[in-house]
């Protein structure tokens, strides 16, 4: 069900509404990867599960000219909608030496011992087989290459749905953030577990940090971001009868709640806490 959600065009459209906070975390992820101090040349980078291209765009904006001249960048995602969006962004922003294509992170088909850096932003908690994806990252990295990941610990665009659902009739349930994280890939919201996954996969020099960020979005845009995982979550927590009776009404209850909290033309805070991890291939 979750993989089906990723392939729907509406997912790519809604995902762009969360791009602002993704851009903020992209800067942190790139900094934590240590790429600015890397002596590896040329820089051969995979933006893995690239989404809307936040990592790649930030790299193009922040790398110095010497690094950009040596850069070879591949943006890969399993969602055709995400790849199309990234291609458009690539052209609009004039990225250097970059390509975007369909890539399955669990079986990439990419060459071994090839990349200096692999970035995977907000995806390891959603891969159907994250251990296979970790093995692939290790395989395709050069010796001394770096994997850098981010995963959500908390995200208020998920948790805000609980009080929204409470305003609806029918005594409907909605999960806490801990329950949502457990529905996805358990453990990627805990620092010690993320470290253990990196080390068990074969990475060394593992660094873990937890970072909180927020940005402001117009209420309408924040409302769209809140709906990103809604079909998947409701499929797990509501009966089919409840979905048939109430699911179509959720967006209107959501907007009424947000407009009451922040005003019809107001700004809503988008808040997240993410685990930033990096590790090196021996």
Swiss-Prot record:
The keyword Nuclease does not apply. Belongs to the class I-like SAM-binding methyltransferase superfamily. It comes from Aspergillus fumigatus (strain ATCC MYA-4609 / CBS 101355 / FGSC A1100 / Af293). This is Methyltransferase tpcH. Gene3D superfamilies: Vaccinia Virus protein VP39. GO terms for biological process: methylation; secondary metabolite biosynthetic process. Keywords: Methyltransferase, S-adenosyl-L-methionine, Transferase. Methyltransferase; part of the gene cluster that mediates the biosynthesis of trypacidin, a mycotoxin with antiprotozoal activity and that plays a role in the infection process. The pathway begins with the synthesis of atrochrysone thioester by the polyketide synthase (PKS) tpcC. The atrochrysone carboxyl ACP thioesterase tpcB then breaks the thioester bond and releases the atrochrysone carboxylic acid from tpcC. The decarboxylase tpcK converts atrochrysone carboxylic acid to atrochrysone which is further reduced into emodin anthrone.
């Amino acid at each position: 069900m979750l993989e089906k959600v990723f392939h729907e065009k509406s997912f790519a459209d809604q995902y762009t509404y969360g791009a602002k906070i993704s851009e903020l975390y992209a800067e942190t992820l790139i900094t934590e990867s240590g790429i600015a101090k890397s002596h590896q040349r040329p820089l051969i980078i995979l933006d893995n599960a690239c989404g809307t291209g936040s990592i790649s765009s930030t790299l193009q904006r922040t790398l110095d000219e010497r690094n950009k001249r040596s850069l070879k960048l591949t943006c890969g995602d399993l969602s055709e909608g995400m790849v199309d969006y990234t291609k458009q962004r690539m052209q609009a922003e004039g990225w250097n030496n970059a390509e975007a294509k369909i890539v399955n992170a669990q079986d990439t088909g990419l060459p071994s011992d090839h990349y200096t850096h692999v970035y995977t932003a907000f995806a390891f908690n959603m891969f159907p087989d994250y251990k296979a994806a970790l093995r692939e990252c290790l395989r395709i990295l050069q010796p001394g290459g770096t994997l850098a990941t981010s995963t959500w610990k908390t995200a208020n665009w998920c948790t805000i749905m609980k009080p929204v659902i409470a305003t609806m009739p029918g005594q409907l349930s909605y999960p806490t953030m801990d329950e949502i994280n457990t529905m996805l890939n358990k453990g990627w919201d805990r620092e010690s577990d993320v470290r253990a996954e990196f080390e068990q996969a074969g990475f060394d020099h593992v660094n873990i940090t937890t970072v909180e960020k927020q940005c402001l979005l117009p209420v309408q845009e924040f409302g769209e971001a809140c709906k990103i995982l809604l079909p998947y979550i409701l499929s797990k927590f509501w009966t089919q009868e409840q979905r048939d009776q109430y699911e179509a009404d959720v967006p209107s209850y959501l907007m009424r709640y947000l407009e009451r909290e922040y005003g019809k033309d107001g700004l809503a805070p988008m808040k997240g806490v993410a685990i930033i991890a990096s590790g090196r291939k021996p």
